[in-house]
Amino acid sequence: MSFAGQAAWITGASSGIGAALARALAAQGARLILSGRNTAALEDVAKDCGEALVLPFETTDIAAIAPAVEQAWNWSGGIDLLVNNAGISQRSLAVDTAYEVYERIVAVDLLAPIALTQALLPRMVARGSGRIAMISSIAGKVGVPMRTAYCAAKFGIAGYADALRAEVGHLGLQVHNIYPGSVATDVSRNALTADGSKRGVSDQTIDNGIPPAIAVAQMIDEMLAGSREIIVAEGAEK
């Protein structure tokens, strides 16, 4: 089994897990819709992806979602796989963290993927097929210090996906919860600190983490196998 000939829409596709996933799916023959905020970086990824549409937009801009869905659907003839990957992490103690940081992380990591899924869902239901993948985190299963906002959002998106699966599974749709552990990306470098500024330095555990290409290979294999929960972490291999 593979994603050959299928249309996959990935948010946060300009780097890290999103970019690696795009390249891996393209290698299987999938057609890609690549979304994010950095158009130049998306175009660089698209060069490796064969048939690809670069569709930049801000996922928290609710007004931009409906036009993006329309464009993606019309270009592809129907989305077979939506990967809600765009996100932002946190590195700060709760006692020090501004409320605005909670608002920002919940907006990006929870409300934005819900909004995009809700906009696309009626089309998938009407067609009677499709996959929706939520990139949560190990921090969406276990409370991790210095990440209270991030944990809240990632637990939340996992709960949304679990409930959604119960609603649409009998309609031909599959919903996957993906829980990456330490994958070697810029996630910790781009994390927000207590005042909302970018951290700018990486965690050693992240730097020494699973290479993105290996992580996404597992994700793809387990999605094709129909796994509901996909844990991508050292020692979690099946």
Regions found by a protein language model. Give the residues of each.
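Conserved glycine-rich cofactor-binding loop
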Residues: A7, S14-S15
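Conserved glycine-rich Rossmann-like NAD(P)H-binding loop of the short-chain dehydrogenase/reductase
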Residues: Q28-D44
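The beta1-alpha1 cofactor-binding region of Rossmann-like NAD(H)/NADP(H)-dependent oxidoreductases
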Residues: F57-P67, Y99
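Substrate-binding pocket helix/loop in short-chain dehydrogenase/reductase
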Residues: L93-A94, A98-E103
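Active-site helix of classical SDR
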Residues: T117, A153
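Residue(s) in the substrate-gating loop at a strand-loop-helix junction
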Residues: S137
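SDR active-site lid
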Residues: A166-A233
